Swiss-Prot record:
Gene that encodes the chain: proB
Pathway(s) the chain acts in: Amino-acid biosynthesis; L-proline biosynthesis; L-glutamate 5-semialdehyde from L-glutamate: step 1/2
E.C. number: 2.7.2.11
Originating species: Rhodopseudomonas palustris (strain HaA2)
Protein name: Glutamate 5-kinase
Binding-site positions, substrate: S56, D143, N155
Keyword Transferase applies: yes
Transmembrane segments annotated in the record for this chain: none
């Protein structure tokens, strides 16, 4: 597959590691470098692209502000350092993006937020609303509450999960190396940069070293794992050097990097997962008007639902049937079974008065809905 161009992509996640963002000697943000990156992000934003940032650095910034000694931190020390660093990190991103008239929204996530469907939907909705408002979500693992048993441990895989969650079509991992090499370039003069990876094979995985630093928990192995997550969900990924000023501009200009390509697109991959990999927990029967709307690519609104069967939680997969009981499709429902039954047949403005809270306008959003024949 040919190497893509940066301008081919509409929704982009940019991951920035601690070793790029923080000067390891001074323990402070590399302000000049970050200003250049923010200018690159602003240019993409002006061109109408959705941009999200997955930013490391909270622990590194916190330990600097607290003047902690070098060396490994215990879990509770890391959590406390992150509590201080997250404030500084959020302020930093807000200021550099604000210089370009762009609002920044901080989102702190844990492993469960991307693995438990209800929390997944909440996080995805927050990201979607920020993007709708033309803000830039700045996402980090919530190191203040994550434990060793329930954490990512690196932001490469977190970035891949965020890209999947947001249906991004490109994930950029800015690193201290400009891509995947056939051998460690620091010790092997014959090492060659691999410009395009069509599939993550055992051979590709074997090329990943274990390089990391005191400030950064990740290495090439975690980047390969991120590539597997991203490409399986229909998101292209690339690794490029962030050690230069204006790294995104360099990528756009054809600079050295490694592309990990996928034949699918995010929406197709996600809908394949909904249709074939999730066990339905219930059924929604809808009227003829709703059937027509769904087949025209619309979301399913409460007004179109005439019957609710089964016991399901918010975020579970359900079958959608027409008035003749024929299966119309499958999707992830935005309400649990009890609430869905209470608001069926009612207009969206009635939902708040019935439930006492402001709920989703849709029973199933079109991005969470697969309309077609039932899987075999």
């Amino acid at each position: 597959m040919a190497r893509p161009k940066l301008h081919d992509f509409r929704r982009i996640v940019v991951k920035v590691g601690s070793s790029l963002l923080i000067d390891s000697g001074a323990g402070e943000v590399r302000a000049t470098w970050l200003a250049a990156l923010a200018a690159d992000i602003a240019e993409l934003h002006r061109d109408g692209r959705d941009v999200m940032i997955v930013s490391s650095g909270s622990i590194a910034l916190g330990r600097s502000r607290l003047k902690l000694p070098r060396g490994a931190l215990k879990l509770e020390e890391s959590q406390a350092a992150a509590a201080v660093g997250q404030i500084a990190l959020a302020r930093t991103w807000s200021e550099v993006l604000g210089h370009h008239g762009i609002g920044a929204g901080q989102i702190l996530v844990t492993l469960q937020d991307t693995e438990e469907r209800r929390r997944y939907l909440n996080a995805r909705s927050t990201i979607a609303k920020l993007l709708e408002w033309r803000a830039v979500p700045v996402i980090n693992e919530n190191d203040t509450v994550a434990t060793n048993e329930i954490r990512y441990g690196d932001n490469d895989r977190l970035a891949a999960r965020v890209a999947t969650m947001a249906s991004a079509d490109l994930l950029i991992l800015l690193s201290d190396i400009d891509g995947l090499y056939t051998a460690p370039p620091g010790s092997n003069p014959d090492a060659k940069l691999i410009p395009v990876v069509d599939s993550v094979t055992a051979e590709i995985e074997g090329m990943a070293g274990a390089a990391g630093s005191e400030l950064s928990r990740g290495g090439m192995r975690t980047k390969i794992e991120a590539a597997k997550i991203a490409t399986s969900a229909g998101t292209h990924m690339l690794i490029a050097s962030g050690k230069i000023d204006h790294p995104l501009k360099a990528i756009a200009g054809g600079g050295p990097c490694t592309w990990f390509l996928t034949p699918a697109n995010p929406v197709t991959a996600r809908k394949r997962w909904i249709a074939g990999s999730l066990e339905p927990k219930g059924t929604l029967t809808i009227d003829a008007g709703a059937v027509t709307a769904l087949r025209a690519g619309k979301s399913l609104l409460p007004a179109g639902v005439i019957r609710v069967d089964g016991q399901f939680a918010r975020g579970d997969a359900v079958i959608v049937r027409g008035p003749d009981t024929h299966e119309i499709g499958r999707g992830l429902v935005a309400y649990d079974a009890d609430d869905a039954d209470r608001i069926k047949g009612r207009s969206s403005p009635d939902v708040m008065s019935i439930l006492g809270v402001s709920g989703r306008a849709e029973m199933i959003h079109r991005d969470d809905l697969v309309v077609g024949t039932a899987p075999g």
